[in-house]
């Protein structure tokens, strides 16, 4: 039985504060494009899905996109600044949308967290001032919003009042969305100048530092953390997946993959499933308890901004060449893939009827896929997996080819090496008999 999130809404990055990346009743492949929503200008953030809309942040507005049609349902004006993923939390009977807005540039920039009541579509005062710009997304849990900035700060903000609960200072940039699980907040700060990456475990209530993890020799690259059931998982630039104890940060296991990880990508982690993807295009299913590799699929296309998600029993991932790919969770076979087209596929949100992802380019767009009952499923192994039947067939072909290339010319050469009067052996017999 696969672990599932408690709602069919995809309210934040990877669907839940711990980043499980799982929707048990999501649509199955094959897929067809249901609609495309193009930004009026600039890029778009990865979407969240709440009720009947997908919500995405644009350069100067936040858009609500109708899931049924792909048309614009509403928009909220935004001043500008870096585009980061929004989130939706629940306070009482209200759904509160939170996103980041920035006015001004450089030292004069004024970055704030904005709260909007989705029931009334009214902004809630006051805005919460932040110390720096926030390139990553927002996690919501227990009535609070958690986010980081590019100066290493992690914040907790009360969703109901906008009050800044606490600020924790780290070294480097918090590029990804913090993970929240069992009263702890996990944030990764990548410090390029010092060449180190640090995972901070913070008390969700006070922001006090509980422990830190800084793997030796890993450099300044660490993926977005995922956490559940006392386990925290990150990938590092030394090609290792690390599983840590949520209690004290001690390492439970590590597992080697083929390459390093994107600092804005996360794993999909639940009690019985762990899916990770590396930057150059490898997807791996690992055992959460031991780190043993169950299968891998080498897509050989960059995965700069997407994270694996699980829709039912299908693993979905977006690629740099514009494809969405679907891989069967149990077999590790590729069962469906979209067409290559310009613009990478970034972070993915899943609803019971649709898969929605952000697509890069200028302007950016959201693309939604639906189940296509007339489509065809594939059954393609990773190009790194050897098919025994094919291997035997290729070996047989190689033997025949070797015979043709080596033996036949040798026979021809041997015949040409005989005396010019070719039938000598037959002619010489009588002569030899005479000599005898």
Language-model region placement:
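Short loop/turn segments that connect beta-strands within beta-propeller blades
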Residues: 66-70, 117-121, 158-162, 203-206, ...
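Short loop/turn segments immediately following beta-strands, especially the blade-tip
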Residues: 369-380
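Juxtamembrane cytosolic interface motif at the C-terminal end of transmembrane helices
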Residues: 406-416
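Blade/loop signatures of beta-propeller domains
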Residues: 5-34
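Hydrophobic secretory-pathway targeting helix
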Residues: 1-3
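Repeat-blade elements of multi-bladed beta-propeller folds
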Residues: 7-17, 40-62, 80-114, 127-155, ...
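A short beta-strand motif characteristic of beta-propeller blades
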Residues: 33-37, 71-76, 122-128, 163-168, ...
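Cytoplasmic C-terminal tails of single-pass
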Residues: 416-436
């Amino acid at each position: 039985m696969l672990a599932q999130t408690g709602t069919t809404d995809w309210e934040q990055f990877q669907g839940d504060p711990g980043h499980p990346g799982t929707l048990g009743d999501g649509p199955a492949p094959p897929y067809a494009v249901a609609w495309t929503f193009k930004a009026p200008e600039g890029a778009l953030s990865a979407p969240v899905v709440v009720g009947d809309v997908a919500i995405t942040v644009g350069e100067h507005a936040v858009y609500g996109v109708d899931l049924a049609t792909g048309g614009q349902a509403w928009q909220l004006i935004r001043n500008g600044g870096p585009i980061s993923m929004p989130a939706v939390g629940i306070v009482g009977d209200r759904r509160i949308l939170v996103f980041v807005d920035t006015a001004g540039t450089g030292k004069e920039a004024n970055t704030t967290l904005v709260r909007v009541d989705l029931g009334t579509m009214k902004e809630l005062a006051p805005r919460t001032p932040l110390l720096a710009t926030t390139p990553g997304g927002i996690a919501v849990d227990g009535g609070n919003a958690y986010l980081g900035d590019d100066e290493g700060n992690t914040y907790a903000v009360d969703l109901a009042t906008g009050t800044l609960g606490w600020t924790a200072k780290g070294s480097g940039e918090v590029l990804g969305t913090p993970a929240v699980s069992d009263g702890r907040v996990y944030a990764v700060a990548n410090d390029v100048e010092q060449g180190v990456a640090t995972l901070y475990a913070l008390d969700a209530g006070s922001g006090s530092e509980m422990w830190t993890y800084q793997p030796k020799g890993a450099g300044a690259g660490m993926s977005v953390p995922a956490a559940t059931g006392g386990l925290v998982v990150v990938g590092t630039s030394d090609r290792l997946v690390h599983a840590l104890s949520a209690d004290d940060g001690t390492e439970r296991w590590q597992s080697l993959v083929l390459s390093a990880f994107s600092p804005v990508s996360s794993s999909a982690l639940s009690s019985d499933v762990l899916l990770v993807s590396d930057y150059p295009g490898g997807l791996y299913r690992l055992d959460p308890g031991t780190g043993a590799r169950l299968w891998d699929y080498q897509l050989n296309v960059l995965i700069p901004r997407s994270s694996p998600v699980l829709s039912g029993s299908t693993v979905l991932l977006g690629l740099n060449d514009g494809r969405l790919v679907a891989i069967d969770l149990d077999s590790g076979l590729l069962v469906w893939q979209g067409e290559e087209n310009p613009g990478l596929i970034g972070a993915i949100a899943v609803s019971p009827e649709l898969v929605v992802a952000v697509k890069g380019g200028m302007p950016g767009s959201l693309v939604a896929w639906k189940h296509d009952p007339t489509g065809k499923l594939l059954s393609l192994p990773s190009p790194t997996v050897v098919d025994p039947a094919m291997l035997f067939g290729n070996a047989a072909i190689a033997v025949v080819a070797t015979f043709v290339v080596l033996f036949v010319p040798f026979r021809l050469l041997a015949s040409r090496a005989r005396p010019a009067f070719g039938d000598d052996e037959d002619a010489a017999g009588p002569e030899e008999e005479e000599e005898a």
